């Protein structure tokens, strides 16, 4: 589907962006989240310059995204290691039961 214009209010400013209809709810939620972050940041820091607040919020969001990506990579690596260990355990159990023959290239990869 084609993108359609969506009007947003962020930190007292109007913004019109194009967005696919199926992503409209997520966009509105993101705008609400950004609005709340900016308001919280303004109250915590006493910074009144909107541009500075936006940059600080962007840095915070970027940092959070970087942390989440690292967690995802670590989790994926951990799962890959567990899968390999499980695969080796299964192969060893089958070998011990004589169900598969031990020969090069017989690994399940």
From Swiss-Prot:
Transmembrane segments: none annotated. Pfam families: ZapA. SUPFAM superfamilies: Cell division protein ZapA-like. Residues 21-99 form a coiled coil. Keywords: Cell cycle, Cell division, Coiled coil, Cytoplasm, Septation. It comes from the Bacteria. Its main location: cytoplasm. Homodimer. Interacts with FtsZ. NCBIfam families: PRK10972.1 (NF008209). Activator of cell division through the inhibition of FtsZ GTPase activity, therefore promoting FtsZ assembly into bundles of protofilaments necessary for the formation of the division Z ring. It is recruited early at mid-cell but it is not essential for cell division. This is Cell division protein ZapA. It comes from Klebsiella pneumoniae (strain 342). The gene is zapA.
């Amino acid at each position: 589907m084609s993108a359609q214009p969506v009007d947003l209010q962020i930190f007292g400013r109007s913004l019109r962006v194009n967005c696919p209809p199926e992503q409209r709810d997520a966009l509105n939620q993101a705008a609400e989240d950004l609005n709340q972050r900016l308001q919280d940041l303004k109250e915590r820091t006493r910074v009144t310059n909107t541009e500075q607040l936006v940059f600080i919020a962007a840095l915070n969001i970027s940092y959070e995204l970087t942390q989440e990506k690292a967690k995802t990579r670590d989790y994926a690596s951990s799962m890959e290691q567990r899968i390999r260990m499980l695969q080796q355990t299964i192969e060893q159990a089958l070998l011990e039961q004589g169900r598969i023959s031990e020969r090069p290239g017989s690994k399940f990869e």
